[in-house]
Amino acid sequence: MPVGTAVHEKTFQLCESLSYREWSGYYAVSVYETHHEHEYNAIRNAAAMIDVSPLHKYRISGKDATKFVNRVITRDISKVAVGQVIYCCWCDEQGKVIDDGTISRLGENLYRWTAADPNMRWFHQNALGLDVTIEDISNQLAALAIQGPTSGRLLKQACDADIANLKYFRHTHGRIGGVPVDISRTGYTGDLGYEIWIPWNEAPKVWDALVERGRHFDLHAAGILALDVARIEAGLILIEVDYSSSKKALIESQKYSPYEIGLGRLVDLKKEYFIGRAALEGENRTGPRRLLTGLEINWDDVERLYDAIGLAPRVPDTASRVAVPVYHGGLQVGKATSTTWSPSLKKMIALASISGEDAAPGTQLQMEFTVEATRHKVRATTRGLPFFNPPRKVATPIV
């Protein structure tokens, strides 16, 4: 049975919908009100606070910590400075992705690693012969994401750290409400945003301090439904939705390489040995058989389907995590894995896994679309990702 996070007593007081979902053994708010509209608008137009404490978190230390990290991930951690954060993935020997997450370099041989799934056993299996300590600190460290255009100004008021000059994918230290915290300029919304890493038992104090300061910046608590829409707009993948971990895949077609899910840029074939390198070198030469791409669904086609049965077109209430077939010339060439109506773009969009020859931007495809339990096809055009990428996301300084 799930348990509450470090700030469950705070989120529960605000959760009018009483709508929760299980996330890594914790209760996570799906939506605070009866609809996530206000929460989404906070992410895109003001500031939103999201409890991301259920993330799996690890502390890597010891003389061989850097060597261990480089053995496991596809990027070269030796190029990463202390104070920097990277997004990365890690693979099995066949070059298929096990998980993705972020690594913060806290010291020369000290790292904080976040992941979607549990990885402790696999980490230990690949640390043999190394002087490295791997600690699961998931229930010692809470995390709050502050995301949105006013998030930087809010944190400038709430924290004693130099937030104004904190660069994208860097981290710093400070105090909020008298509590020592780490702050990284990272997030899962594709917008200006930060993640605050807090000692578990001190998290309610930080929540209260942010709420108090946030009154002047239109801060709202936001749940998973609003976050889902934002991350699709940002072109950010979700494990077990847009790809399957190779540890859980039952058949080969359920396994994905970094090149197949838009993470090819994270593969550094110039560095020393890492797990999966040989397989990825081969795929780099031949090219992946499928690619992650964006889809823009033709809304005129959707309207015509509703018109034909005498109904007004219906904008989907929530993002869909159900895979639906995508066709080209009557043949299935892939699937849309995450689909949503984008309130900011006023378009229906999707993340899709499409065969390489059909994934070029501007390709006209068809996507399955169901109206009143009847399946149809609507036109969909491939395009690059992300759909939404505001300059403020990476701008420095924050004013």
Q: What does each of the following model-derived ranges do?
A:
Residues D51, D100, E195:
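Acidic active-site catalytic centers that drive phospho-/nucleotidyl reactions
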Residues M1-C91, K96, L292:
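Acidic, proline/glycine-enriched N-terminal capping motif
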Residues R71, R75-G129:
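Well-ordered mid-protein domain cores that form the structural environment of catalytic cofactors
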Residues M1-C15, Y20-W23, A28-V31, S104-V399:
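Conserved, structured C-terminal
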Residues I50, I98, D301-E303:
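Residue-level micro-sites within transmembrane alpha helices that shape
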